[in-house]
Amino acid sequence: MTDLTTSDSLQPAWQTRDHLDDPVIGELSNRFGPEAFVVQATRTGMPVVWVKREQLLEVMSFLRKQPKPYVMLFDLHGVDERLRTHSQGLPDADFSVFYHLLSIERNRDIMLKVALSEKDLHVSTATKIFPNANWYERETWEMFGITFDGHPHLTRIMMPQSWEGHPLRKDYPARATEFDPYVLTKQKEDLEMESLTFKPEDWGMKRGTENEDFMFLNLGPNHPSSHGAFRIVLQLDGEEIIDCVPDVGYHHRGAEKMGERQSWHSYIPYTDRIEYLGGCVNEMPYVLAVEKLAGIVVPDRVNTIRVMLSELFRINSHLLYISTFIQDVGAMTPVFFAFTDRQKVYDVIEAITGFRMHPAWFRIGGVAHDLPRGWERLLRDFLDWMPKRLDSYVKAALQNSILKGRSVGVAAYNAKEALEWGVTGAGLRATGVEFDVRKWRPYSGYENFDFEVPVGNNGDCYDRVMLKVEELRQSLRILEQCYKNMPEGPFKADHPLTTPPPKERTLQHIETLITHFLQVSWGPVMPANESFQMIEATKGINSYYLTSDGSTMSYRTRIRTPSYAHLQQIPSVIRGSLVSDLIVYLGSIDFVMSDVDR
């Protein structure tokens, strides 16, 4: 197991570092020579290395094959660099592509960047090294117009096939009022419907064999078992799945584009909608990344309050997941019990934040307000109620022989496959990999809590759902510690960029009154830099990679969600299985389409 004391997460959050002392920089220099790279100093907590386009695949292969390899392509996307003013010391670039690699054995990350000219937006595909680069490269091409040479199927993934332009370019409008009014004529509707017709040849599929034709079946985008606006086209021989093509993007809302026109403060409500069951869990990585940019260290009370709200939302999400999984297998009753239990969670959340699903309650430098009187009683009542209810779910449903017969050994994959496809959360831990960000890279004071990380052995549907049950128990354990050990102190940091600033000062000092007005109306100005924060969200690892150009809003907001990677893995897991197995597999993934499509 990796020595957690070596993790960069224990370094001061405000520290800008080039990470030249990281062993991987020495390894790269020894292999390729120090002149082959430009190392960028950031607040991401990892080495950020610009490499030559011609050497990119060689560098990635080298890192992939090291004794302690970088086994996961955690993220891949682009940046339009043309309007960036604070880029001194970096390679000249109109656009750039970044590759975020993760090593489990080292418990470390590295980010590779490639500079591109607007006249030559080409880079080689990484799909032969990391198969999960497929969807990320498709999205990067779609959003920026960067071509990945050798990609097996470089087509649109988020936007309709008829869409024109590349939305994340800086010269692409960010507001609907900048477009002509949209009119859907009958002719245009027919063309849009025709574009959705699945053509097997486009995906390298055969329509049949010499003796019989294959059936092509649309599951979704309005099927109850697809868990949202998600379409998956199945190639069937009888009920056996020969192959399938997931089709996403129906829930895309341009969340990353919105980050470029909202202030650092006013973007917080948008984070709640990324994974709409996660509530405050979604806000955590964003505010932590902004606080790294600002150099804010929050009081212990803020850390503990944030942990408490995050674990309440984790329980709320897990309850829905467990009960709907049971429903997908065929048992209806547990869903109704779960909504009773979730209401008790919402009672606590609503009393504290004033809202239920989308509280937008975390703030830059703190939380919106202090805990209300009586929060302890509400939390105590829930902690006394929930353990016995959880036992009843296990006894009445999850130990049922029919449920186990439908899920044990179904849609199983191993640790190597999970890492290759970017699987995180319970989906990865079900294969025996004990990687939980709260333990391995503690944030918001998680290092002060006593809890276990449940792991599985088989990597199948049953392991995944039972891990969620055990995670729910550990969340209750964390909440018990919040109840008993809530620190005293302020609910906001004493820092100039805390937003909004403490209200009590605004009527005493003209300086703070002006600051309050500017930060609420225009937004705080963050120092030019880059920051990154990953957290253990309800469905896997969620992260924000923020680029500030010294303005009141983000220059580039990259949101990496777990569900996107998990859906891309589906074909590799389900080929050769039955349609009924796919239904159970989809239920075991734990995804919502807002998390996929952003």
From Swiss-Prot:
- The source's superkingdom equals Bacteria
Entry's EC annotation: 7.1.1.-
Q: Which reaction does it catalyse?
A: a quinone + NADH + 5 H(+)(in) = a quinol + NAD(+) + 4 H(+)(out)
UniProt KW Kinase keyword: no
Report the locations given in the UniProt record.
Cell inner membrane
> Is this entry keyworded Nucleus?
no
Its function, per the record, reads: NDH-1 shuttles electrons from NADH, via FMN and iron-sulfur (Fe-S) centers, to quinones in the respiratory chain. The immediate electron acceptor for the enzyme in this species is believed to be ubiquinone. Couples the redox reaction to proton translocation (for every two electrons transferred, four hydrogen ions are translocated across the cytoplasmic membrane), and thus conserves the redox energy in a proton gradient.
Name this protein carries in UniProt: NADH-quinone oxidoreductase subunit C/D
Instruction: Give the encoding gene's name.
Output: nuoC
